[in-house]
Amino acid sequence: MTLVMSPDSSYGRYDAPTPTDVTSPVHREREPELHIEFDGTTVLCRVCGDKASGFHYGVHSCEGCKGFFRRSIQQKIQYRPCTKNQQCSILRINRNRCQYCRLKKCIAVGMSRDAVRFGRVPKREKARILAAMQQSSTSRAHEQAAAAELDDAPRLLARVVRAHLDTCEFTRDRVAAMRARARDCPTYSQPTLACPLNPAPELQSEKEFSQRFAHVIRGVIDFAGLIPGFQLLTQDDKFTLLKSGLFDALFVRLICMFDAPLNSIICLNGQLMKRDSIQSGANARFLVDSTFKFAERMNSMNLTDAEIGLFCAIVLITPDRPGLRNVELVERMHTRLKACLQTVIAQNRPDRPGFLRELMDTLPDLRTLSTLHTEKLVVFRTEHKELLRQQMWSEEEAVSWVDSGADELARSPIGSVSSSESGEAVGDCGTPLLAATLAGRRRLDSRGSVDEEALGVAHLAHNGLTVTPVRQPPRYRKLDSPTDSGIESGNEKHERIVGTGSGCSSPRSSLEEHNEDRRPPVSADDMPVLKRVLQAPPLYGGTPSLMDEAYRRHKKFRALRRDTGEAEARTVRPTPSPQPQHPHPANPAHPAHSPRPQRASLSSTHSVLAKSLMEGPRMTPEQLKRTDIIQQYMRRGESSAPAEGCPLRAGGLLTCYRGASPAPQPVLALQVDVTDAPLNLSKKSPSPPRTYMPQMLEA
């Protein structure tokens, strides 16, 4: 039945097409893949396999599955769980038996409530559906043609034999000519690895060997592609078959290169390789012996080119390879190829009916050799990578050793061991590492001059390679001296100043003077930047040194110092002080009678501290009340006792005035200005002696 899709058809409900360009490659890449099942030219339902009526809820489905899914999501029906492990097959004839598994399959194939589309069917969607249908019909036609070709045994036999002859270079006639030429003019190769077909990689480059062997491997891959039915397999199945059977087919093709009577192998480049010359490391002797034994067994059968081609096809197309998906098609191809081989053997060897079984019995041994060869190849790759890594490390260590040795001789903070080696020149070698390894390091004799010809021209020959080292100007390092601190002061002169020699001069110092005489004059441009700056004249004017500028006070401390200095100058001036009404006894410690020293006081250097000390004592209200009580008792005592008998006045700590509270004298200033007494940083005024308090209270 033909499916007709017209713009007015009720084939689904779709969104309007977007304005995106359909022909753009980016749009083609972003288009989702269509999951469409066909029965000839009819689109089938993704759920039950019935004829699809349109695109419903995101998939192509029939009317029955569309209605079932709509009822389930609209009414939110909870179906009874399946009693058959939830794996019921949903078909057209039994889709109503298990509703639970039917809804589960609807969701699994992609049906969704949000996938409903409205509008007409887009032209792009129609084109995609038609293309998928055409591709499906084309692939089905190819499968039918391949099936017909597999069923046609003579045609299959002819195609396989022709493919073998076109892709294999080592047929019986060609190998016979190579063997005759090798026996007449034998050219033996050097000892090589355990791989039987490795043509002396020590004498030829790896690139040449890879190119020569890659051509043979490519022939096996092309041969597999020409086998009827191989192109119908998926890419994964093709890769699985080639990966597991490539060495087997390659070994069957090259089995005629082994010469068992002479215990030799004809390599791909035509050279002969003796069996004893193969290296037997890493248990390779067992692999070599097994390979020669299997080759002798296969060569004794005298297979023809047609039999070898069919046997190679059977080795490649094997249904028991792990990872195959389309096992049925592979098994079908294997059966047809085996039947063709039986036909050829029956024609060539009618007297040996069991020859096919004998040939098929070699397959387990062939797979064993393939496994051994793969293991040996893995070991070889690991050892080869490790060897290359060690060579790279050794080269890097050699280069770093040469560089570190040159740097250590050029600038060693400890100095050399002997004085004779300290004056040698360290030159940069511009030759490759090979020249440095072959020539070694040359040292100059410090007691004599260096031969210019020996330094300038030095040729090194190795395997026809001539290396000429490039001469570079030698570098001299400064010798260690007991008085050398390692820091340049910037006052050194470019010209060497000759002075009187030291009485305890050593050979080292003489060598140093000799080297300094030979040192070329250094221009100002070659000097370090710091050295040029230190030798330049100062940029600021005046005689003050750089340290004075560095330790100059901040501007806020300068202003405060200026204010305190003026106040101190006014205080230092000698002014007549008025005599009090009640003169006290002479007290040299009183600030009013003791002249200030003419030198700079502490206030000039500690302005903030002096200001805080010159302020009056700050007392709490309780202390002020207590002071008033004491002053009242003192006034009462003045009327009864003479002024000279007052112990407080005699102590010079308090001065009482009539009719007013006494003003405190600058006792703190006295304590600050006295040079002999220690500096008192307390802001509180000293309390009167406790011995006078009872007398004051009694008065």
Curated annotation (Swiss-Prot):
What CDD domains does the record point to? NR_DBD_REV_ERB
One short Pfam family name for this protein? Answer: zf-C4
Bias kind Basic and acidic residues: ranges: 510-520, 561-571
| Source organism of this protein record | Manduca sexta
- In the UniProt record, the gene name given for this protein reads E75
Domain (NR LBD) ranges: 152-399
Tell me the domain of life. Eukaryota
- What InterPro entries does this protein's entry cite? NHR-like_dom_sf, Nucl_hrmn_rcpt_lig-bd, Nuclear_hormone_rcpt_NR1, Nuclear_hrmn_rcpt, ThyrH_rcpt, Znf_hrmn_rcpt, Znf_NHR/GATA
Q: Where is the composition biased (Pro residues)?
A: 575-588
Which residue ranges run through the membrane?
A: none
Give the span(s) annotated as Disordered: 1-31, 466-528, 561-607, 679-699
Q: Which residues bind DNA?
A: 42-118
- Cite the GO molecular-function annotations of the record: nuclear receptor activity; RNA polymerase II cis-regulatory region sequence-specific DNA binding; zinc ion binding
Does Acetylation count among this protein's keywords? no
Function, please? Implicated in the regulation of ecdysone-triggered gene hierarchies. Probably plays a key role in mediating the regulation of the larval molt by 20-OH-ecdysone.
Record protein name field: Ecdysone-inducible protein E75
SMART domains attached here?
HOLI, ZnF_C4
Q: Where are the zinc fingers (NR C4-type)?
A: 45-65, 82-106
